[in-house]
Amino acid sequence: MNFCYDVLNYKYPSRREVVYGRKGMVCTSQSLAAQAGLDIIKAGGNAVDAALATAACMIVLEPTSNGFGSDAFAQVWMDGKLYGLNASGFSPALLTREALMDKGYEQMPKFGWEPVTVPGAVSGWKKLHDRFGTLSWEKIFEPAIRYAEEGYVVTPVISKMWRQAWDDYEESLSPELFEEWRKVFAPDGHTPRAGEIWSSKVHAETFRELAATDCESLYRGRLAGEIDSYSRTTGGYLRKGDLAAYEAEWVQPVSTSYRGYDVWEIPPNGHGIVALMALNIMECMQFAAGHDSEEVVHRQLEAMKLAYSDGQQYIADPRSMKVTTEQMLSKVYAAYRAANIGQRAAKPQYGNPASGGTIYLCTADGAGNMVSFIQSNYCNFGSGIVVPKTGIALQNRGFNFYMDPESANCVGPHKKTYHTIIPGFLTRNGKAIGPFGVMGGFMQPQGHVQVMMNLIDFHMNPQEALDAPRWQWTGDMNIEIEQGFPMDMAGRLKARGHHVTVATDSMNFGRGQLIFRDENGILTGATEPRAGGAVAAW
């Protein structure tokens, strides 16, 4: 007898606890990908090899969030030092404000060729592999190729996102562009339902070509030619020259101290410093009440609004920024901003400092090496553009550009836009604690702040810190809170002037993972119930 049940609705919250390991650990939102990454460690690979294998698997297992056309960022703790990688691509040389205005655009389109930027993730993979990798590309890509060729069972959350993408692209794309997306991602005439099997031979072949060319084909080989040809024939801006000119870059992570801990993020063009600015503001305050206090939530929200207002005003391609990262992270400036927080909700305004669909994963090996890695096509599958015969779904990161010529983030040729994806890392006294991240667009800095405060201020264990109900600022005076706060929380916040919505769906509140390593080498991992993920441990 077959049971009849709904895999998209869960009446009772899952009871999760932290997971322990010693020799290796991988956390991500897809259990098959986590297991594949751990298998790489068991085969003799290190944390970077595992991160690359997991990231490759996620392109197949969660195509609703990332792909060959993604951007990526990473923080790597290796041999006692923290390294940062910015693998975000720039806009095509042909993408100018004037070209868009000539087509009648007053703001950046969300889908189609206009928001497509150079995919940076694969170049980032190569940078990581060249510097830290120990296994061959053939070995690293083996699990992803297997899932692409043999297929896998689509999970409930992913099936829901897949269906939403169909609706978005069918409405927004030309029939020609939508048909290429449909051929790969809905070959049976509908998107895969939960429990159905999806496979993609073209994904497997692209992985094989990347392995054979040391990931060069996407930028200076056959795959680059396929992208160029399709772009030219369908009205796109991206050319082989743009791809050949791009290379991911190593960067120095930036940090702030928060109550004795150092919280690390990638510097702009990403908005990780928004989380650091908010933590700087919060450090100016002391909290007698706990996480569920309306006073705490009010102050967190006001700090987040101030930090985000500054971030959205100033963060852009570093070559175009009008203030420095150091100015934005000044403790003196944070104290000035904190003094603006009162008992009532305030309309957010940026200050004047003195002269970010996504997947997140983290890995650790037995030698103490750890990786915080994030990769994204931005909105679901991205732009909706799928290059024929390759499985390459191109991102729509350019949607974050502004059309205002006075903005540092104004669209322009070979320019990096304001970026939402941010991998985090935590240290104390120069020693690694571990990687953490919360995927989910503009929720990401808000998630980072809440998870860090849950751990440091409210002394929650890692699983509690992820499980705890969250709030998010959605713009102007508007906020959303999850179910799980005290029943009178919404009313109390409304009395302070916040415009409050109690969300019925937790999908928009981020989906996080973390791994911490103690002084004895014990690994502690956690992943949250908002995602269908898992911790794979050894």
Model-derived regions, located:
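Active-site rim segments in enzyme catalytic domains, especially the processed small/beta chain
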Residues: 60-77, 81-86, 237-239, 369-434, ...
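Short, small/polar residue-rich loop motifs at catalytic or cofactor-binding pockets
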Residues: 250, 355-358, 419-421
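Glycine-rich phosphate/pyrophosphate-binding beta-alpha loops
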Residues: 264-272, 358-362, 374-385, 438-445, ...
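Internal maturation/activation junctions in enzymes
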Residues: 3-6, 284-377, 389-390, 397, ...
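Short beta-strand scaffold segments in enzyme catalytic cores
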Residues: 66, 71-78, 359-364, 423-425, ...
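Extended C-terminal subregions enriched in glycine
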Residues: 367, 415, 448, 457-507
